[in-house]
């Protein structure tokens, strides 16, 4: 399998490109996504896929998440870049109630494909309302899957898994890792399975579990 050294955000972007080419029901929306997004993961998407599938929105995170819930029921596969994890609190009803629970509340015989991208943590100058680690919120709501990639390879592989997942996924990219670089597989079928641990060092005396 061939590899290329690239940045964490670029690896996320590669996954988006590959999956949008493969599946025309995927579209992305958020503030500034048509011009590359907050951290560059969406760079070039509007040029290739057009503004019908790469949609700039105003500053209303609740609207973005609500649109994703409705589009999911209609059979589309929305991706929402919320800009920062802090904004999970603004869109909480749509994410933690509607996206997470509608299938089960209403007996819907449909998948709820949706990926919500939350950049979390901080880097210089982000400010107190753009620096929270909100991934723990999603862990307490049945119906959601939560991922937090720690390197460029996982950023690509987990994004591809999230885009193929029939349940809503909260994809937490780490701001401080945004421009870190690593070897990324170029195989368009490379996926990191959600929910399967990577064993970094096998042993029998002690287990350390982290993310």
PLM feature spans:
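Glycine/aspartate-rich loop-and-adjacent alpha/beta segment that forms the canonical ThDP
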Residues: 179-197
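Glycine-rich phosphate/diphosphate-binding loop of Rossmann-like nucleotide-binding domains
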Residues: 206-211
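Short, flexible, solvent-exposed loop/turn segments with mixed acidic/basic and small polar residues
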Residues: 135-136, 196-198
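Thiamine diphosphate
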Residues: 1-177, 187-189
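Glycine- and Gly-Pro-enriched alpha-helical subdomains that act as flexible
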Residues: 92, 195-196, 202-203
């Amino acid at each position: 399998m061939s590899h290329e050294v690239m940045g964490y955000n670029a690896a996320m972007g590669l996954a988006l490109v590959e999956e949008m080419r493969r599946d025309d029901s995927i579209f992305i929306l958020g503030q500034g996504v048509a011009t590359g997004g907050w951290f560059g993961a969406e760079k070039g998407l509007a040029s290739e896929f057009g503004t019908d599938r790469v949609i700039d929105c105003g500053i209303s995170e609740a609207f973005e998440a609500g649109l994703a819930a409705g589009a999911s029921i209609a059979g589309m596969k929305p991706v929402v870049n919320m800009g920062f994890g802090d904004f999970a609190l603004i869109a909480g009803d749509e994410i933690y109630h509607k996206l997470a629970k509608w299938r089960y509340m209403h007996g819907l015989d449909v998948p709820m494909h949706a990926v919500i991208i939350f950049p979390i943590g901080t880097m210089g100058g982000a400010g107190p309302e753009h620096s929270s680690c909100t991934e723990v919120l999603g862990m307490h709501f049945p119906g959601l899957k939560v991922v937090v990639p720690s390197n460029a390879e996982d950023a690509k592989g987990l994004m591809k898994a999230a885009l193929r997942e029939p349940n809503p996924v909260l994809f937490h990219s780490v701001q401080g890792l945004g421009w870190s670089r690593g070897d990324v597989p170029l195989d368009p079928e490379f996926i990191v399975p959600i929910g399967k641990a990577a064993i970094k060092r096998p042993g029998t005396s002690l287990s350390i579990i982290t993310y």
